[in-house]
Amino acid sequence: MKIVGVIPARFGSTRFPGKPLVNLKGRPLIQWTVEGAKKSKLLSEVIVATDHEGIKAAAEAVGVKVVMTDSDLPTGSDRINAAIKDVACDVVVNIQGDEPLVTGELIDRLAQVFVDDPKMDMATLAHPISAEELQSMNSVKVVVNCRDEALYFSRYPMPYSRMSAQEAGSMDGCLKHIGMYAYSRNFLKQFCEAPPALIEKAESLEQLRALYLGAKIKVIRVKEASVGVDTPEDLARLEKLLSSQGM
């Protein structure tokens, strides 16, 4: 089984234009992500998918293959599908380009799902949710079945509880979703060829298209999310964190 990791890195960003190239402790952000991904033991190859020559140069400087993709692709999944068009592989892991502290171990937990069950369609990550996160529309929730397969994703608190958030506390039936995925190559192609589903458009969550198509999505439980960079404020907090750790 050949498993590849793809890092989609688009230059344009509503909240943080040029984010993959911003300086973090002397290196472009994209290089941190690439170096973390290269520590995976299960990935055969790491590829950066981008629409910008500067990102291409930064990625090639740390020794990874780069595929140029259309800047108008609608989703990160479409960018990944385009990037592997000429790549022979069975499974692809979507590694977010704005996750500079991603670890090889985390990537391998996703990849291992397909080693254990080659018939799985997708895998993703989630961690315990707090009462505050449960009520936040910015926190995507996932509920799972007894096999830790996704039943539904939503921005809305779920499942419905007759108790208040304070009484319910951190609900075991609900997890906070982390937007990192692995797909079988065949399912990724099917996903990208399908039109957006009504539930996907209603919640603005592309993973709901996968559920609409009948996909099995394994949810891997982790203790906490890695640190993502969505805004300049996130970058400042991360720099402070790294400094406190002597990095």
UniProtKB/Swiss-Prot annotation:
GO terms for biological process, alphabetical: CMP-keto-3-deoxy-D-manno-octulosonic acid biosynthetic process; lipopolysaccharide biosynthetic process
Pathway membership, UniProt: Nucleotide-sugar biosynthesis; CMP-3-deoxy-D-manno-octulosonate biosynthesis; CMP-3-deoxy-D-manno-octulosonate from 3-deoxy-D-manno-octulosonate and CTP: step 1/1; Bacterial outer membrane biogenesis; lipopolysaccharide biosynthesis
Single GO MF descriptor: 3-deoxy-manno-octulosonate cytidylyltransferase activity
InterPro entries linked: Cytidylyl_trans (IPR003329), KdsB (IPR004528), Nucleotide-diphossugar_trans (IPR029044)
Swiss-Prot/TrEMBL keywords: Cytoplasm, Lipopolysaccharide biosynthesis, Nucleotidyltransferase, Transferase
GO cellular component, one term: cytosol
Reaction catalysis annotation: 3-deoxy-alpha-D-manno-oct-2-ulosonate + CTP = CMP-3-deoxy-beta-D-manno-octulosonate + diphosphate
HAMAP family: KdsB
Family: Belongs to the KdsB family.
Protein name: 3-deoxy-manno-octulosonate cytidylyltransferase
Gene for this chain: kdsB
